[in-house]
Amino acid sequence: MAKTLPFSRALLLSLSILLVARAISAGDIAIYWGQNGGEGTLASTCDTGRYAYVIVSFVTTFGNFRAPVVNLAGHCDPAAGTCTGLSDEIRSCQGKDIKVLMSIGGGAGDYSLVSEADADNFADYLWNNFLGGQSSSRPLGDAVLDGIDFDIELGTTTFYDTLARALSSRSTQAAKVYLTAAPQCPHPDSHLDAALNTGLFDNVWIQFYNNPLAQCQYSSGNTNDILSSWNTWTSSTTAGKIFLGLPAAPEAAGSGYIPPDVLTGQILPQIKTSAKYGGVMLYSKFYDTTYSTTIKDQV
């Protein structure tokens, strides 16, 4: 006859299993910041306590050996040197154990890489102006950001793998360079496939929005497409963690918005079973008035 555990020990064991299960499935929230002056400061974004990653966006012009251009919309003007005060805010965020990344690309801009030498040259610029290198004209001041985010939606599709390798090669045990990417949900992504295949990316936050014809996002109560696309991405992508990228409000994207109750009740319980699940990415801070607060405990 099998022995039974005393009630107190059985209860303790059950609680331990529950806590471990919750720890395994717990995810983070990443947010894009920088494209609307009405979204509040970088420091106030981090002060909310809702985000583990804040992605400063964007470097909108680069490649072909041109001088890169940083666009932070209504916040400040990097070209005029009025963004250097962000360094204190970046350090404040990092002091709260929040990773701050610089995003390159975006949905509007003028960028392409034309050769391996061009990619290496741009990697040097990113290293010297945002990461651990040195430059007399760092757009955001002397703070050292945690890494680079690839949000490549325009231009040529080549040499981003070279860029990823060049940036990754600068990582050390003392100072890691985090690499993240935001591919579109149609698989494989036309711009980032080669880069993602390097296996060098720590987080990949897939944009499950603005692709209404691709059958890879949520629409009108249908969760099948987004869940199928999630499974395709997680089974074929080598990355530290994979995030579900969503608009933070209906106005934040042309399509793909998921009501919070649908996300927490029908989608998150399914995708959190994946070992690669990392959490949710939201676009953007300006639109995130209530969404992250509503879903945070379930992410």
From Swiss-Prot:
Record field: temperature dependence: Optimum temperature is approximately 45 degrees Celsius. Removal of Ca(2+) from the protein by EDTA treatment decreases the optimum temperature to 35 degrees Celsius.
Q: Which tissues show it?
A: Highly expressed in seeds and to a lesser extent in the skin of the pomegranate fruit (at protein level). Not expressed in leaves or flesh of the fruit (at protein level).
Quote the InterPro entries the UniProt record gives. Cts1-like, Glyco_hydro18_cat, Glyco_hydro_18_chit_AS, Glycoside_hydrolase_SF, Glycosyl_Hydrlase18_Chitinase
| GH18 domain segment(s) | 27-299
Q: Which residues form the active site?
A: 153 (proton donor)
Asked if the Swiss-Prot or TrEMBL record annotates the protein with the keyword Transferase, the reply is: no
Q: Name one GO molecular function term.
A: calcium ion binding
**GO BP terms in the entry:** chitin catabolic process; polysaccharide catabolic process; seed germination; seedling development
Field pH dependence: Optimum pH is between 2.5 and 5.0. Removal of Ca(2+) from the protein by EDTA treatment narrows the pH range to 2.5-3.5.
Family statement drawn from the similarity comment of this UniProt entry: Belongs to the glycosyl hydrolase 18 family. Chitinase class III subfamily.
Cite the record's note on assembly: Monomer.
Summarizing the function annotation, the protein's role is: Hydrolyzes chitin. Probable calcium storage protein of the seeds. Binds calcium ions with high capacity and low affinity. Involved in seed germination.
Protein name listed in UniProt: Acidic endochitinase Pun g 14, amyloplastic
Q: Which organism is it from?
A: Punica granatum (Pomegranate)
Task: Tell me the organism's taxonomic lineage.
Answer: Eukaryota, Viridiplantae, Streptophyta, Embryophyta, Tracheophyta
